[in-house]
Regions:
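Short, charged, surface-exposed secondary-structure boundary motifs
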Residues: 66-73, 125-128, 169-173
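Short acidic, glycine/serine/threonine-rich loops at helix termini
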Residues: 48-53, 70-72, 105-110, 148-154, ...
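Gly/Ser/Thr-enriched, mixed-charge loops and adjacent short helices
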Residues: 1-90
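Gly/Ser/Thr-rich loops at beta-strand to alpha-helix junctions
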Residues: 42-47, 102-103, 144-146, 303
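Buried hydrophobic positions in well-ordered alpha/beta secondary-structure cores of metabolic enzymes
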Residues: 21, 40, 80-84, 96, ...
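Short hydrophobic/aromatic-enriched beta-strand-loop microsegments
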Residues: 57-61, 114-119, 156-164
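Phosphate-binding and adjacent anionic-ligand microenvironments
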Residues: 94, 134-319
């Protein structure tokens, strides 16, 4: 009755979304390129839109499964091993994964290697500024790579670091001329769309970048490295009781930690948590979860080995 009376109206948001994407991207370039793209919806909300927008893509977990096959629909490498294998074993060029509500992105190169959000943010800036001639401010969360700031300096863009939580980025996107906003957990937004995270949208930008440049994802990452240098990043969550967590944070506030193993602290930033810099490109961050007995530790360095070494020294120092 409410429908017939016009009090309840059904709106096809998926159709609106796809039409918006069709006018915003060169989908012909993507769909007619020689490159083979893959998509893992993780049984989430992105499945039907991507089927429509990318009819030639290799699809995984694009059907309904209320239990998500027992795997949390979070696009991080440990949840995407099947997708990684699919890409590597079938000679696919690039794979996009999105989470349950399709706002966070995971990415794989042709070898099935996971590409983290820091690299994705840098790739997006590189494409939009160098290849498309766009400009604007870049806003990133406190846990993001220092390479973002270096990339922005290279291109003459203003960059601002904000607290963790996408609301801090969305607010800036609504009131300022922001080119891109991004956070470490895979939530990224760009101008010309909504001031909110959208994993499918970011994937389409990257697929378009590859298709129109004719370059592999690995080659495009090499272009980024030519500007900011190679780097690696990792986050490890330490599950500890709240008393221990509180004690460690008090030690951070009190300036107790001046060295972690062989890594000497040169400066500390405290925008949201504690970021201990060992040099301009190498840092460790400690931040408590606000909702659970977890201490989040993050590190960035030139190599993966060094990142894990820093995180191991951190754990040994604080616990």
């Amino acid at each position: 009755d409410l429908i017939s009376e016009g009090k309840v109206i059904y709106v096809d948001l998926e159709d609106m979304y796809c039409k918006h994407a069709e006018t915003s991207f060169d989908l012909d370039a993507i769909n007619n390129s020689d490159m083979n793209f893959a998509y893992d919806a993780m049984f989430g909300a992105g499945m039907n839109a991507v089927k429509r927008l990318l009819p030639n893509a290799t699809l995984l977990h694009c059907d309904d499964n209320p239990g998500f096959l027992g795997t949390a629909p979070e696009p991080i490498h440990r949840n995407l091993q099947e997708f990684s294998d699919l890409i590597r074993d079938n000679n696919l060029d690039c794979g996009l994964a999105t989470d349950g509500d399709a706002d966070r992105i995971g990415l794989y190169d042709s070898e099935g290697n996971f590409v983290d959000s820091h690299h994705i943010i840098l790739l997006l800036i590189h494409y939009m500024v160098k290849y498309k001639g766009m400009t604007g401010k870049v806003v990133t969360a406190f846990s993001c790579s220092v390479k973002v700031e270096q990339m922005c300096k290279h291109y003459g863009l203003e960059q601002e670091t904000v607290q963790i939580g996408f609301k801090h980025i969305s607010g800036k996107m609504i009131t300022e001329d922001v080119l891109l906003g991004g956070e470490e957990s895979g939530g990224i937004a760009t101008t010309g769309h909504i001031p909110e995270r959208d994993g499918i949208w970011m994937g389409l930008i990257l697929f378009e970048f590859m298709a129109k440049s004719g370059k592999s994802l690995e080659d495009l990452i090499a272009e980024v490295y030519a500007i900011v240098g190679p780097f690696a990043f990792e986050r490890i969550d330490l599950h500890i009781d709240n008393d221990t967590k509180h004690s460690i944070i008090e030690d951070c506030k009190g300036g107790k930690f001046t060295q972690f193993g062989k890594y000497k602290v040169e400066k500390v930033e405290t925008t949201d948590g504690f970021k201990f810099f060992f040099d301009a490109d190498t840092w460790l961050m400690i931040r408590p979860s606000g909702t659970e007995p977890v201490l989040r530790t993050y590190a960035e360095a030139a190599t993966q080995e060094k990142v894990f070494d820093i995180l191991a020294d951190c754990k040994a120092t604080i616990l």
